[in-house]
């Protein structure tokens, strides 16, 4: 007897992927086995080894780890955030080995696209979900290049990677990375702060001062002082260096003839 050929609509595959987070090939096979019945395909998946992945795919993943890897020549580096649901799994060696494999692969293959990286590890992620019983998410990563890269990771919760040029040493780059981890600047220099951000903050501080009953001239002076503090909070070079609070980061960079060209800072679960 001739075997019946079943044509599966691509929209049906997309819907099954959306509802299960399973790969295209597996979804197509499941739909063929279920004669195109979406709900039956899901039921069959849940009965199979993909059951846990289907069940867990919508869970929030706010735990996990931050990892950083830099090439031996210190000129190319990657920082990544991979999430799970609990600290228990985050500390599990299997989860940590998965994270290590992901970042090393991204580094060696010079992957720049998060979608490519997620697809590359789709099967391994699904298997890990089934093994540890929690959803796993390769959430984000950043690539930095430069004359000299440094990094720092604090307890797998905060990660920093910095690109610099000049008379750079590994120890100094680590200390600058530690400073960024602790102080969380948003920009390198005052000139990097968008004009609309400065105008908005200045207007807010001026309004606050004027509403307190101060004259316009005094309000301007108060606003100038508050804007100075504002820049100290968000601009790296204006901050006091945590290793020597008697000097600013800007003074440190001048002293050692160093220029910070770029940096990135990840904090686990931020903006989720």
Curated annotation (Swiss-Prot):
Region (Involved in Mg(2+) ion dislocation from EF-Tu) location: 86-89
- Predominant subcellular localization, coarse grouping: cytoplasm
Q: Where in the cell is it found?
A: Cytoplasm
Reply yes or no: does the keyword Membrane apply: no
Recorded hits in InterPro entries, A to Z, give: EF-Ts_dimer_sf, Transl_elong_EFTs/EF1B, Transl_elong_EFTs/EF1B_dimer, Transl_elong_Ts_CS, UBA-like_sf
Name the UniProt key words of this record, in alphabetical order. Answer: Cytoplasm, Elongation factor, Protein biosynthesis
**What molecular function terms (GO) are annotated for this protein?**
translation elongation factor activity
Q: Using the chain's own numbering, where are the disulfide bonds?
A: none
Q: Name one GO cellular component term.
A: cytoplasm
Cytoplasm: is it a keyword of this entry? Answer: yes
Q: What does this protein do?
A: Associates with the EF-Tu.GDP complex and induces the exchange of GDP to GTP. It remains bound to the aminoacyl-tRNA.EF-Tu.GTP complex up to the GTP hydrolysis stage on the ribosome.
Family membership = Belongs to the EF-Ts family.
Name this protein carries in UniProt = Elongation factor Ts
